[in-house]
Amino acid sequence: MKKTGIINSEVSAVVANMGHMDWLSIGDAGMPVPFGTKKIDLAVDKELPSFMDVLNNVLKEMKVQKIYLAEEIKDQNPAQLENIKKALPDVEVAFMPHSELKKSLTKTHAFIRTGEMTPYSNIILESGVTF
């Protein structure tokens, strides 16, 4: 049994298999996942686990060089945007319309579904390198 880090076997495997510039997405309970995109469903109840709990745990093991967020988060969920910026203070942020973010999920290695119930709590993480 793993002693530290992500203990969910599917999430751990996806993070371990990431290469430079690969994408991984994490999102709220309502985000539609395109057919063909691997979905890792962690949601067990409303707000359980939260988006930020999952993001913070993934960030312990994954080097991120850029993130993609929905433009709408700026007006519709500024508190969550602030949480994300605090978790990734030195990472480039790219905004796109929510409709484009949804389409971009087809390019991610997996989508991790949380129990989050706040709007636009979705992110695409672009993997960096550790050297």
Curated annotation (Swiss-Prot):
Active-site residues, record numbering mapped to chain: 20 (proton donor)
Superkingdom of the source species: Bacteria
Presence of keyword Isomerase: yes
Family: Belongs to the RbsD / FucU family. RbsD subfamily.
PANTHER family per UniProt: D-RIBOSE PYRANASE
UniProt xrefs under SUPFAM superfamilies: RbsD-like
Reactions the enzyme catalyzes: beta-D-ribopyranose = beta-D-ribofuranose
Subunit composition and interactions: Homodecamer.
Enzyme class name: isomerase
Gene: rbsD
Keyword set, alphabetical order: Carbohydrate metabolism, Cytoplasm, Isomerase
EC number assigned by the record: 5.4.99.62
Keyword Cytoplasm assigned: yes
Organism of this sequence: Limosilactobacillus reuteri (strain DSM 20016) (Lactobacillus reuteri)
Physiological role: Catalyzes the interconversion of beta-pyran and beta-furan forms of D-ribose.
Pathway(s) per entry: Carbohydrate metabolism; D-ribose degradation; D-ribose 5-phosphate from beta-D-ribopyranose: step 1/2
Protein name per UniProt: D-ribose pyranase
Annotated GO MF terms: D-ribose pyranase activity; intramolecular lyase activity; monosaccharide binding
One GO term (biological process): D-ribose catabolic process
